[in-house]
């Protein structure tokens, strides 16, 4: 079978603050297909295999591996079905729950759980916004399931009767992921991915209580205990059933139970424990066996003759569960991958005993016993055993479906117009097969074929499965009625097949993303233009003026936000969140994620990763509040500049190719600050010791420990220069002192550069040029330079004894805003000064104390936001207050009520971004304060994930982009992923966002 497409990628590589050199993944249910052996009503044994790769549930003959039947779905099937009375119940990422007769695969019923929105991109696959990411459980006469991952978009807990009729439905505030469990006490236990499980009442869906957990989707019930994990450190913990008391912790990813015992496996040993003693809080080990197994485990047999099967890399071990004696180790070829899941069936009327294993590369293996009842060593392949073969660009595809030369030529012209070879493509027509085959061989696009009816869809799916392309490169969707199943602005390429198109251009063009291509049925090629006037986030704080406002009118006018895509860049390549790394960037067709030592190009329309560029050694700079931006995008989003150690790099932002570089050309200097506008680059040079660039753990620890304290040193440069965008020199200025990067701001329209220059002798003689602000202020000047020639337009002595922690400059419409802070009695006090653009003379000054106490989560280094609201007025959002930019007087933001202050509803590290009437920040979750909202609570938690510790929520291009930045987080957030939301206008709310109401049972049980 094709290699599984797991729902989530690799975890972060560790956590500096927690001294973890690795972090275990917590959601691994679909790392491999989960086999299930079950008998139908006649006693016939079926091997059921769900596929997360090619979107189906298979029934195979466990003796031969031949297919009995299959049920195709509209998305990945990630969980094994539940079986009751010869019926299999399961869900899929298409948001539907199905009941299928086991004997012949007949569909008994099918229900969509959520509102049935158009499909979005989820980790590279087109799925429902409300995927079924739990198992479907049959218990207490009901069928239970959960749909959705994002409470802001609706997550639903439902119960159907066994005929598919809705019994109850609840909208919940959790992100449900994992196998549902039940007891005879009318309770259903629900895992929530990386977070903690909870219990609900099976009668009406009421939430009863949370269960403590180290976090993770593994859960197991015994009569007296609840087991949950694996947490960050691969440990499963046991609790009393109500979760009131933790009993024991076991170093293991999986636990099996039976016959009054439990068995654990951790990669070095398998151990057996007395379950009754565990319930009393005693970890009594009955036996242990050295073993590399750490994946799935099964216990089978009679209570006095139990057998244990354990999966690991390269083998399945068969152990006497009573004594720990290794009976046999069943070898698995290494190129088959790691054995993850197991299924076993005892001998019965349907045939002999069989053991089944699946691997993370998609292999499905079966062993049959010898006459003695011991599994033999003959390996029988129950399905195609080799990993999929993907055609490389330029390799001819299926000869039997060679397209006409005219189609080949038209497709070549269309793909030449693409901004990137990667992305999503849609092919529609009465016979799309040839065009899809051609695009498979010539591009890297994920291709969607649109079928007119189920018969055509089934035929196309079988063809591409036979080519081992289905799910990996190609999927087929059926057009149901007039409504497209996809979100708009999603596809990079849409193809109308010549002479066979059944859709009009005005139906297809909305599906094409800006910059994407539509190929007409007559061969004409049309590129979709970009909308004008949308905002961008090209520099660290949006633009070189450092306003932290992208000016995006669509995001700023939003009444709500709709999920567009999630997935893509995950935590494994991102810097430790505590390092407060640089912001992501986005303009036009590009998004740039500044990962740990690499730049990653992402398509903002659908989350496709386009490229990765490895930066020179020690280019990655940390602790952004004390530094400044060193990577920026051009206004059209087509090129990206990066000041990397000894060179400034110019890259193609759409392809990741190096176009040009500029050496530093000065001994013992490195490139520092960088900004770009019009035809110019503003650059600085610094000492190699100035930035925080260490790669060793001991030094990095100071970035987390020391640099979250007060009065930390700022990164400074010694020279400033301006070049053309082609790196041609215009002018350079040897500074009269040191230039802290946070104090640099540039207005390319007005032609001015503003900076703070520290000229004291102690600064000039400093050895590292990483200097505390109080020392910089000993003899500091605010300087304004002419951008054209570098001449000093004016300078003013800057006397500011209160400036202790941080320094920011912003070029606002009303003047130059300087921000600093000091720490007093456990609280941050902020100081602001507005000065004239033309003279540097003071206009106003103010100070305020932060409303929250504490100085260990960055409370003293918040960056202010200069917000141009929808009424056209610019206001200073200096947390927690709002000020008139012109006078410095306190005021109300447009849309807010009297006595307003910004009080984030949750943990408040990180700083603000915004546009229009919307503010974005961390409040435990990525949160929007929507001042357009007519709701009583204007705050919306967009996702059950953790934002970064500085800025990673950026409004740009008519989208709200939230690339992953929580790497190293060990807390219990359900999701850890990149996100994109689209703004929804007030007039579109009813059509674009629908939240289903709760439905309660008709006959509620009497209260207990």
What does each model-identified segment do?
Residues 460-461:
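Conserved SAM-binding loop
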Residues 420-438, 446-448:
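Conserved class I S-adenosyl-L-methionine
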Residues 468-481:
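Conserved SAM-binding strand-loop segment of SAM-dependent methyltransferases
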Residues 26-57, 71-97, 124-158, 170-198, ...:
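Repeat-blade elements of multi-bladed beta-propeller folds
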Residues 503-516:
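A short glycine-rich, Lys/Arg-flanked "PGG" loop and its adjoining helix->strand segment in the class I
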Residues 482-493:
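A short acidic, Gly/Pro-enriched loop at the edge of an enzyme's catalytic core
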Residues 449-454:
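Conserved acidic E/D residue at the C-terminus of a beta-strand in Rossmann-like folds
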Residues 1-37, 44-50, 56, 61, ...:
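Aromatic (tryptophan-biased) beta-strands that constitute blades/sheets of beta-rich domains
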């Amino acid at each position: 079978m094709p290699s599984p497409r797991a729902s989530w990628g690799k975890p972060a590589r560790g956590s500096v603050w927690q001294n973890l050199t690795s972090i275990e993944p917590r959601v691994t249910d679909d790392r491999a297909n989960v086999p299930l052996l079950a008998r139908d009503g006649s006693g016939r044994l079926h091997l059921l295999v769900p596929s997360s790769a090619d979107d189906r549930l298979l029934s195979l003959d466990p003796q031969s591996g031949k297919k009995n039947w299959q049920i195709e779905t509209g998305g990945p099937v990630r969980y094994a079905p539940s079986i009751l009375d010869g019926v299999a119940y399961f869900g899929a990422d298409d948001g539907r729950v199905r009941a299928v007769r086991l004997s012949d695969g007949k569909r008994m019923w099918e229900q969509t759980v959520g509102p049935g929105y158009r499909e979005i991109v989820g980790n590279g696959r087109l799925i429902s916004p409300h995927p079924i990411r739990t198992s479907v459980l049959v218990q207490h006469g009901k069928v239970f399931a959960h749909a959705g991952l994002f409470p802001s978009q609706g997550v639903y807990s439902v119960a159907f009767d066994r005929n598919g009729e809705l019994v109850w439905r609840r909208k919940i505030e959790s992100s449900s992921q994992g196998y549902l469990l039940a007891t005879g006490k009318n309770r259903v236990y629900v895992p929530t991915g990386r977070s903690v499980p909870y219990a609900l009442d099976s009668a009406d869906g009421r939430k009863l209580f949370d269960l403590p957990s180290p976090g993770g989707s593994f859960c197991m019930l015994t009569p007296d205990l609840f087991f949950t994990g694996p947490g960050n450190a691969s440990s499963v913990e046991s609790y009393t059933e109500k979760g009131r008391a933790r009993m024991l912790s076991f170093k293991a990813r999986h636990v099996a139970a039976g016959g009054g015992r439990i068995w654990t496996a951790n990669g070095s040993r398998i151990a057996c424990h007395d379950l009754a003693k565990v319930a009393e809080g005693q970890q009594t080990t009955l036996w242990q066996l050295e073993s590399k197994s750490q994946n799935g485990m099964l216990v089978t047999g009679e209570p006095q003759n139990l057998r244990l099967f354990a999966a690991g890399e390269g083998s399945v071990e068969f152990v006497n569960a009573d004594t720990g004696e290794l009976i046999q180790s069943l070898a698995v070829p290494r190129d088959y991958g790691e054995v993850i899941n197991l299924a076993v069936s005892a001998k019965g009327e349907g045939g002999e005993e069989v053991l089944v294993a699946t691997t993370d590369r998609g292999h499905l293996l079966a062993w049959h016993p010898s006459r003695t009842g011991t599994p033999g060593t003959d390996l029988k392949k129950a399905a195609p055993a080799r990993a999929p073969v993907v055609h490389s660009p330029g390799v001819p595809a299926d000869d039997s479906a060679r397209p006409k030369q005219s189609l080949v030529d038209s497709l070549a012209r269309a793909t030449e117009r693409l901004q990137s070879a990667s992305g999503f493509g849609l092919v529609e027509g009465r016979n799309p097969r040839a065009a899809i085959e051609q695009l498979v061989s010539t591009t890297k696009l994920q291709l969607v074929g649109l079928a007119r009816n189920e018969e055509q869809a089934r035929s196309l799916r079988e063809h591409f499965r036979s080519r081992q392309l289905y799910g990996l490169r190609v999927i087929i969707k059926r057009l149901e009625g007039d409504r497209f199943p996809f979100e708009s602005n999603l596809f990079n390429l849409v193809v109308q097949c010549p002479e066979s198109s059944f859709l009009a251009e005005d139906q297809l063009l909305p599906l094409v993303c800006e910059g994407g291509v539509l190929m007409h049925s007559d061969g004409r090629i049309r590129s979709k233009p970009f909308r004008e006037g949308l905002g961008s986030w090209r520099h660290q704080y949006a633009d070189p003026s450092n306003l932290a406002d992208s000016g995006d009118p669509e995001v700023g006018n939003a009444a709500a936000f709709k999920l567009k895509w999630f997935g893509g860049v995950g935590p494994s390549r991102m810097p430790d969140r505590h390092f407060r790394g640089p912001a992501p960037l986005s303009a036009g067709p590009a998004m740039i994620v500044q990962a740990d030592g690499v730049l990653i190009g992402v398509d903002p329309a659908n989350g496709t990763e386009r490229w990765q560029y490895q930066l020179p050694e020690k280019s990655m700079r940390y602790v952004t509040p004390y530094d400044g931006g060193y990577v920026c995008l051009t206004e059209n989003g087509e090129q990206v500049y990066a000041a990397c150690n000894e060179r400034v790099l110019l890259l193609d932002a759409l392809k990741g190719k190096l176009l040009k570089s500029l050496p530093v050309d000065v001994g013992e200097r490195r490139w520092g600050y960088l900004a770009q506008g019009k035809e110019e680059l503003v650059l600085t040079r610094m000492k190699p010791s100035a930035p925080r660039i260490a790669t060793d753990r001991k030094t990095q620890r100071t970035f987390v420990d020391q640099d979250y304290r007060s009065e930390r040193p700022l990164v400074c440069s010694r020279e400033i220069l301006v070049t053309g965008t082609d790196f041609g020199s215009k002018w350079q200025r040897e500074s009269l002192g040191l230039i802290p990067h946070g104090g640099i701001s540039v207005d390319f329209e007005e032609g001015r550069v503003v900076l703070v220059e520290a000229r004291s002798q102690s600064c000039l003689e400093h050895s590292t040029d990483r200097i505390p602000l109080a020392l910089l202020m000993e003899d500091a000047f605010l300087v304004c330079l002419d951008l054209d020639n570098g001449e000093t337009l004016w300078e003013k002595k800057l006397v500011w004894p209160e400036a202790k922690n941080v320094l920011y400059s912003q070029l606002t419409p009303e003047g130059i805003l300087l921000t600093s802070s000091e720490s007093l009695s456990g609280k941050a006090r902020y100081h602001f000064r507005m000065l004239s653009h033309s003279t540097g003379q003071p206009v106003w000054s103010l100070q305020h104390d932060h409303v929250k106490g504490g100085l260990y989560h960055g409370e003293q280094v918040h960056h202010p936001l200069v917000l141009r609201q929808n009424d056209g007025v610019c206001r200073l959002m200096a947390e927690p207050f709002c000020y008139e930019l012109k006078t410095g007087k306190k005021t109300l933001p447009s849309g807010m009520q009297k006595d307003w202050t910004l009080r984030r509803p949750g943990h408040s590290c990180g700083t603000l971004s915004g546009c229009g009437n919307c503010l974005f920040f961390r409040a435990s979750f990525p949160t929007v304060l929507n001042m357009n909202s007519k709701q009583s609570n204007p705050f919306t938690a967009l996702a059950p994930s953790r934002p970064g510790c500085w800025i990673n929520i950026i409004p740009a291009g008519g989208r709200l982009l939230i690339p992953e930045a929580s790497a190293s987080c060990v807390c219990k957030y359900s999701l850890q992923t990149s996100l994109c939301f689209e703004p929804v206008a007030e007039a579109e709310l009813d059509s674009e966002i629908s939240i289903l109401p709760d439905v309660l049972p008709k006959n509620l049980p009497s209260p207990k």
